[in-house]
Design a protein with these regions (language model features):
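Sec-exported extracytoplasmic/periplasmic mature domains
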Residues: 26-29, 44, 48, 61, ...
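Entry/capping segment at the start of metal-dependent catalytic domains
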Residues: 1-32
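Extracytoplasmic
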Residues: 17-22, 31-39, 51-53, 67, ...
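Second-shell loop/turn segments in exported
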Residues: 9-13, 53-62, 77-82, 121, ...
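C-terminal solvent-exposed extensions
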Residues: 3-5, 52, 126, 190, ...
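Amphipathic, coiled-coil-like alpha-helical scaffolding segments used for oligomerization/assembly
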Residues: 57-121, 200-206, 210, 216
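Soluble non-cytosolic domains of exported or imported proteins
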Residues: 15-19, 50, 58-67, 85-89, ...
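Flexible, polar/acidic helix-loop-strand segments at domain edges
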Residues: 94-182
Length: 237
């Protein structure tokens, strides 16, 4: 609460009520190929077990992913083998474990809502809290021609930033040897209080996935977004 990035965390008393970021990962152990599909959090869909269409992030209930899993299967025909919820604290731990993640910027950027502040163009290294402020930013502004302007895109631009940050984090993890089984085990144990996963996604299974990721070129991770168009629904964009 004393961090200048506290707004990026939102109201922690309500954490888990809605998902902030939804991604489907496909990891192929045989080919070491990884694909990531992101869903806009404000995408309107028919929520499983409910009559009206709502934002997809409302399908998630605190530590209970089944409704979200069912919604994705019903709406997109995608089956889910495993589920993992990573909260803000686990995200921060991961970024700090590799001494931060560097991201290049052509111009200064900020988001007064999350506390994001990159004061000058160039390569900026984000540590835990500030990294969260960056990936959660929805009202990012750039400083150009002597003034701040909001022209950094919509939720799709936010998804692109998140996917790019994943690649850069993977690069940092590989460089730090963080996919080594002993390091992965330590990271998982350190973040255990901040991670929720299905019963079949055991520690050994996580280590198996880490072994696959160790052989993946982050630049070769394929990323996709669910196509959607902007529309005002019930007074909201």
């Amino acid at each position: 609460p004393n961090s200048r990035f506290a707004p990026a965390f939102g109201d922690r008393t309500g954490f888990g009520e809605r998902s902030d970021t939804i991604m489907m990962w496909r990891v192929n152990p045989a080919t070491s190929q990884v694909a990531v599909l992101s869903f806009p959090r404000d995408l309107y869909v028919k929520i499983a077990g409910r009559s009206a269409k709502r934002r997809i992030n409302e399908a998630y209930e605190r530590d209970q992913p089944q409704r979200l899993i069912d919604t994705i299967r019903n709406e997109f025909g995608i089956e889910t083998d495993h589920f993992i919820q990573i909260d803000f604290c686990a995200f921060k731990t991961l970024v700090d474990a590799v001494d931060g993640v560097a991201v290049p910027f052509a111009l200064p950027v900020r988001d007064v809502n999350t506390g994001l502040d990159v004061p000058e163009a160039g390569c900026y290294t984000f540590t835990g809290d500030h990294a969260l402020a960056y990936v959660r930013s929805r009202k990012m502004q750039v400083f150009e021609d002597g003034r701040w302007s909001s022209n950094t895109g919509d939720d799709r631009a936010r998804i692109s930033r998140q996917q790019d940050f994943i690649r850069r984090t993977a690069d940092s993890l590989l460089a730090a040897g963080a996919f080594n089984p002993s390091v992965v085990r330590a990271l998982i144990e350190t973040s255990d209080d901040f991670i929720v996963n299905d019963a079949e996604l055991t520690l050994n299974k996580m280590l198996e996935f880490a072994g696959v990721l160790r052989n993946v070129d982050p630049a070769a991770i394929t990323t996709y977004q669910i196509e959607a168009s902007a529309e005002r629904v019930q007074g909201s964009d």
